[in-house]
Amino acid sequence: SAPGVIATAIQRNDVLVRGGGANENKYYLDGIEIPVLNHFAVQGGSGGNASLVNTDLLRSVNFYTGAFPAAFGNGLSSVMDMRMRDGNPTRFKGKLILGASDFGINFDTPVSRNGKTTLLASYRRSYLQMLFSVLGLPFLPTYNDYQFKLASKLGASDEFYLIGLGSFDYNRLNTGLKDPDDDQKYILGYLPENRQSSYVFGAGYVHRFRAGQLRVVVSRNAFTNKLYKHERNDKSLPRTIDYNTEQSDNRVRAEIELRSVGGFRFTGGVGGGSGHYDNTTRRPAYTGGQLRTERFDSRLSFGRYELFATLSREFFGKRFSVLLGLRADGTTYSSEMHNPLRQLSPRLNLSYNFRPQWTFSASVARYYQEPPYTSMGYRDSTGVLINKANGLRYIASDHFIAGIAFTPDAHSRISVEGFYKRYSDYPVSLIDSLPVSTGDFADYTIGDVPVRSVGKGRAYGVELSYRNTNLANTVVNVSYTFLHSQFNRPGADLRPTDEYVSSDWDVRHILNVSAIHKFGRNWTLGAKWYLTGGSPFTPYDFGLSSQTGAWDARQRPYYDYALYNSRRLQAFHQLDVRADKVWYFAKWRLGFYVDIQNLYNFKAAGQDILMPETDASGQYVPDPQRPGHYKMKTVAHDIGGTVLPTLGITVEF
């Protein structure tokens, strides 16, 4: 429900903020970066189907769509700072969740007798494959995740904690469908099976003193992604796709916060670490009119370093505040990226309470983000890191933001904010001259192509929001965003032109309305309705798509990039509702919930599917009029249109 966040129409958990892609957001848990937030993540593009983070374990969440803290780097569109609560210091507490599509257990407990060391943990497992099988969907996902925090108070001024977050995911094809329709056949034709796992383990030490605090965090994360597909989905036949990759990071950061330095507040720190990427790929490709097998192996390691500082002060009885920040990042990946002065990231935030209940705020900043591992580690057929040779650089984004907020009382807030984002040095594919962050939701990796850092873009718009935490015992959130998201279409020589075209996230309109009401007898009803303007799309290249070698390589149609995003789908909207009932007993409580997504079964007409006709045995039919081509047909395709009901019980003790 946050302003400027696009809700996708295909049951995904992608966070698309103010016209930026899902890979432009960064997430932190207790000060430790979380590179993979979602199950079934798209490598190089972030996003995914469901969040790994169990919100029951969180104490607070700060979501920044601008004016990012200097301590948190490597993001272009948003930063989410999540903080976990500590475990219960006096007694064991637990919670069981048994739903129609998942199971979970949470517990928090003292570990030491004096309660100074506590443990908070959760484990969840989905069995969506059962629900999806009943619904006749062509893929059957299963995911598991775990999360924990071990916290210890070493004294009045010192604290130590360990955190962990991880997942194990498996998505297999539903090849047992009886009489699959064309839509199901199409998905079964191109979608590979997928195994993913990820983990983040980190440790933090906090020392508090009279004038501030010192925090040191160390962490390691890893993400493993395996994709494979067999001819005709028959596992006795050879694999046509065999993709195995692992990426990992080791990180350390130290920061000091001083609450009063001559009336100023100062935060500063340093950090460093290393990154590692391994990739073994075997996949079909269609180039130069020939079907071939693309093979490459890549191993990459490099170092990172960062430096940041923030200085802030309040004036005029705390009515006016100023914050100055500076950050610099660098890596040993290449000469283009090793000098942190090239990635100097200044920022200025202003806030002025010019009248009671009225506040004006503004910020201007430059942010930098590393290109995805898939681009950094891509090698050509001779083993050369081709993108390193092409001068791959950090992606840059300049933000200009201003807004006014009115706070009539302690429960409500009304605000309007305008934003302008300017992108530069975006990696552009040498294959289709498009930014590597683009790609439809059928893509399972993004960025593993030859690129050059020549892309430019812009996103701008205005947001209006209203929030009331006690409107007739109801929490109400309403937000509307009007935006444009575009990139500069390079010319044939990849030089910038004056032509701007819509990005994949140029939806123009975003409307979110949500409410949670508490009734008597411990009933709670929540509802969320959201509307997203029509997404742009690119027409198919019929001639290329129908070529037998081209279709056999991809099992999907090819786009006519000369007409990139020149068409637009209709708007999408959806209503989700949830009802909860709780019964309280002496030492435990029982809860029951019903959750329904897409209550009124709205279906949006998507881009038609272009696919070959098949004969009675399921083989593609050649076009007798065009040798070397398949006979093609179009199939209507709806986005959404699935009511997802679930119910469950919770037991807390």
Name each model feature, range by range.
Residues 151-169, 191-337, 353-355, 412-415, ...:
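Face-selective signature of the C-terminal outer-membrane beta-barrel domain
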Residues 176-181, 224, 278-285, 356-400, ...:
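Surface-exposed extracellular loop regions of Gram-negative outer-membrane beta-barrel proteins
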Residues 424, 476, 522, 530-555, ...:
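C-terminal beta-signal and adjacent terminal beta-strands/loops
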Residues 60-71, 77-85, 92-138, 145-153, ...:
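Predominantly transmembrane beta-strands of Gram-negative outer membrane beta-barrel pores used
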Residues 315, 420-422, 441, 446-539:
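Gram-negative outer-membrane beta-barrel transporters
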Residues 67, 84, 100-102, 111, ...:
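Transmembrane beta-strands of outer-membrane beta-barrel pores
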Residues 245, 249-255, 295-308, 389, ...:
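Outer membrane beta-barrel strand-and-loop segments of large Gram-negative receptors
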Residues 1-68, 79-81, 85:
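Periplasmic N-terminal accessory/gating domains of Gram-negative outer-membrane beta-barrel systems
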